[in-house]
Amino acid sequence: MFIKIPGCVLLLSLWPLANQAQPVPAVAPATSPGKTKTAVSTPADLPATARPASPRQLFPGLFEAVQLGRVFPDNKTFVDAAPRQRPAAILAAWRREKARPGFQLRAFVERHFDLPADSAVAFRSNVAAGLRPHLDTLWTVLARPAAPAADPADSLAAFRSLLPLPRPYIVPGGRFREVYYWDSYFTMLGLIEANKVQLARDLTDNFAYLITRYGFVPNGNRSYYLTRSQPPFFAGMVQLLAQRQGNAELLRYRPALEREYRYWMQGAAQLKLGTAAHRAVRLPSGAVLNRYWDDSDQPREESYAEDVAAAKQSRQPPAQFYRHVRAAAASGWDFSSRWFGPAAAGSKSPDGGLPAIQTTDLVPVDLNCLLYQLELTLAEASRVADSPAQANAYAAKAQQRRAALLALSWDPKAGWFQDYNWRLKQRSSVRTLAGVFPLSYGLASPAQAARVAAGLKTSFLKPGGLVTTLRKTGQQWDAPNGWAPLQYLAIEGLNRYQQRPLADTVARRWLALNRRVFTQTGKLLEKYDVVNPNRPAGGGEYPLQDGFGWTNGVLLRLLNQYERQ
């Protein structure tokens, strides 16, 4: 399973959001990288009780009864429901009624909660109109309005899981009724192509608001997501706006970029060699890289029954298992064989599956490429702000990260960039499309990029595009599935290193697959089977979703790049 290898708080000033709907707490300024810092308490640093309460915290007992009793096929239904009364009143009614003959839990929930509506039910695709008109229509279908500050007279506002945002936003679609962090970068690609720059700015402003309010960007704008983030694409969003609007965007979002960097590096300065805390890992060399992490070690509220059942199949202590599962959710790759440890002795399986998940033990190559981009973006923003010392400090941190990541993740025998197990001091043998990120973000050498391109062509390239991994496990982030964001980043990386014929092949195969499925079904999907394009994609903890934000964004970007009309 593994191949052996030889052995700060930053400046924060609040920037104004025009017509901002919600107040933002003031935060003391802090020092530049490398200097002694003064601790500043933020919501991300405070105990969970200081954050908005989640459904499990609000409805103890009832929550477990509903989720473990599978009252709804999807556990996400209940956590997205809005209570019609205060929690104390609902809990009192449940305790009175639950022992009565004929009590029906679903009927009780439907009386006391407003269940989430499927907003896409009324939408019907017009296949005859074509793909581009469909994409234009979907921006409206998937758009959600800004939520103003809670009305003081609304006594139930604090008990809903949805976190208000000051700007309009785009949801992915299907069961995903809220904004998602890394999805939104790829959605923004399409918004900018569609000349909806203001909506792209709205998304970026919403994430800056979340960073200011909570100290980081949560997985999504739900109270039950406030224990973890997702792949940090905020710097990429700012760069998209800067490319379109100029360097003033770097200054506008600089405080939020610095605040997010602080979140990812929390505790790094105090780490001893070979240890980790939160999202930071200090290697034996002294270099610091990062991992995915969740502050909770309990079952995910939105997948509670699934997590409880899966923990019973694992030999790990439940808290450890749940932490790994949640960290995988933070990665966006939930779930994939890239996170799984070795199989038990005597097993014919190449890995131990979900019971052997070990996400927090791994230093992911893709995460550290994104943080490299964040450091370079901060260096650039500091130069624009005429702060050369800060610019040099961030640039140095980026180069230190690059050197450490390349040393640990590059497998010269496989010709691939792979995750690194910091506990075992071993590189993973699992090849995944995360290995294209060093090309996408310019960390790879030309020779390394050429070898990755060769590996993509011989192993990952399928009739519908690039397969996510080379293992077929039944997990949705494994073979035979392909995902829009990974296709796009692979294409970008190949073009960056002059591997244009392969980039063109990947793009055209992905476009053809998207078009074929749309013509047959009238839908654009969350993921696709790229091995057998005539078969729907599978895996995951929920049915295949349509919509779909990041698919739409990548599709429009590639249509304009390869089939501009």
Regions found by a protein language model. Give the residues of each.
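Bacterial N-terminal signal peptides
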Residues: 6-16
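Short glycine/serine- and small hydrophobic-enriched flexible loop segments
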Residues: 189-193, 236-243, 373-384, 440, ...
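Boundary at the C-terminal end of the N-terminal hydrophobic targeting segment
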Residues: 19-23
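Alpha-helical support elements that line or immediately flank enzyme active sites
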Residues: 180-207, 434-445, 487-500
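Long, repeat-rich segments with strong aromatic
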Residues: 357-387, 394, 476-489, 493-501
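Aromatic/His-enriched, Gly/Pro-containing loop or helix-boundary segments
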Residues: 211-253, 545
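Extended, well-ordered alpha-helical scaffold segments
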Residues: 196-207, 248-265, 374, 386-405, ...
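Extended glycan-interaction surfaces of carbohydrate-active proteins
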Residues: 54-58, 62-178, 202-217, 221, ...
